[in-house]
Curated annotation (Swiss-Prot):
This enzyme's EC code(s): 2.4.2.9
Protein name: Uracil phosphoribosyltransferase
Pathway(s) this gene product operates in, as recorded in its UniProt entry: Pyrimidine metabolism; UMP biosynthesis via salvage pathway; UMP from uracil: step 1/1
GO terms of molecular function: GTP binding; magnesium ion binding; uracil phosphoribosyltransferase activity
GO terms for biological process, alphabetical: UMP salvage; uracil salvage
Any Pfam family: UPRTase
Gene3D superfamilies (alphabetical): 3.40.50.2020
NCBIfam families linked to this entry: PRK00129.1, upp
Secretion signal span: none
Amino acid sequence: MAPQLRIFVPPHPLIRHWLGIARDRQTPTPLFRTAIAELGRWLAYEAVREWLPTIPAAVQTPLAETPAEFVDFSQPLAIVPILRAGLGLVESVQQVLPTARIFHVGLKRDEVSLEPRCYLNHLPEQLEVNSRVLVLDPMLATGGSLLYTLDLLRDRGVSAEQVRVLSIVAAPPALQKLSQAYPALTIYSAIIDEQLNDKGFIVPGLGDAGDRLFGTP
């Protein structure tokens, strides 16, 4: 059977809570930043639930020896935030995965063509074999930025099966493109909205995540 794009919208009350705060146009920049970070934290918990390799062990409690299980941190982990909005997710996701290496990719959308232009690429020429990669892209509108980043990862030996994407808001146009180009991909998003406007912004969305994170256009 051919692989099919998997997208999960976790039914967690704290995800809905922080999403509501992030959507509210009255939310000030510091609180918006907190909301995005918290969404990153809870989405990361969900994304790695059955994804991280573990190793069995035994520990001695104050009373007896008992079986235990630990994350196998010898397996390479990477976090790839897509700048600039992806920066809002980095710190909280890194707290969930403290051993992960971070590789920044900076993309700016052309306001006419809506296509991404790369101004920063800190990915190595080749990632470690069997790396697990979390890509942070808060707004999946047209999908151009994520597709560009996935192409960069593919060229460095990373398959879609090795990647999980964290997004705050996703829209059908992006998901359709991703399902065609990378059907084996897995995405975790706080919500899927209905449409894009004529400027390529998600509606209802939450506005420009980068502008609201940093208080600057």
